[in-house]
Amino acid sequence: GAHFTSRDIIYLMSDLLVAGDESAFTGDGISKTVYDMTMGTSQMLTCMEERLKQMDADADVTVFGQEFNPFTFGIAKADMLIRGGDPNNMQFGDTLSDDKFSGYKFDYIISNPPFGIPWKREEKEVTAEFKKGTAGRFAPGLPAKGDGQLLFMLNGLAKLKDDGQMAIIQNGSSLFNGDAGSGPSEIRRYLIENDWLDAIVQLPNNA
């Protein structure tokens, strides 16, 4: 389901995202974009922005987020206003069925999407986009309808710049669910064959 993410885990994700990227923060006019597809109250975006500013206080960091829960969305948008950012970068809606950032590409993506939640509500829109092939986000395959977390991963991959990095939290089922040739298996094959997986970090129970 939807989960609160501790600051320790967010800072670990932030550090992993920028590891080896220090050279990108030398010189003037540094500009970076950060996206969270299930931003909640936007704490991941805030922590990532803080981390990038530690690397270069003068860097122009622009954050973007989408959230389906109206309560947490309101908090995220208010926080953006308080911090002097652009509230229009905070969008309300279901990321899977109503993508508010279609066509966008980001430097960094950080997210803790819900897992173990069916995507039956979004089935019509997701299936239609899958049929578009590479013109959509879900061309590699569709997971079992009982768990949509791999759809969020595909959404993130579709929004990365060529040199972009993504840190995303998933439960263990993403590693082994589905027989060979099934949707989940094809998604994993897509990741491996394109060399898009740098690391898997197993978090402790109840982290």
Language model segments and positions:
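Aromatic-residue hotspot detector
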Residues: 44, 68, 130, 138-142, ...
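Conserved catalytic motifs of ABC-family nucleotide-binding domains
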Residues: 115-118, 122-146
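Conserved Class I SAM-dependent methyltransferase catalytic core
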Residues: 142-206
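Conserved S-adenosyl-L-methionine
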Residues: 2-111, 115-127, 170-173, 180-187, ...
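Short beta-alpha connecting loops at secondary-structure transitions
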Residues: 61-64, 136-140, 203
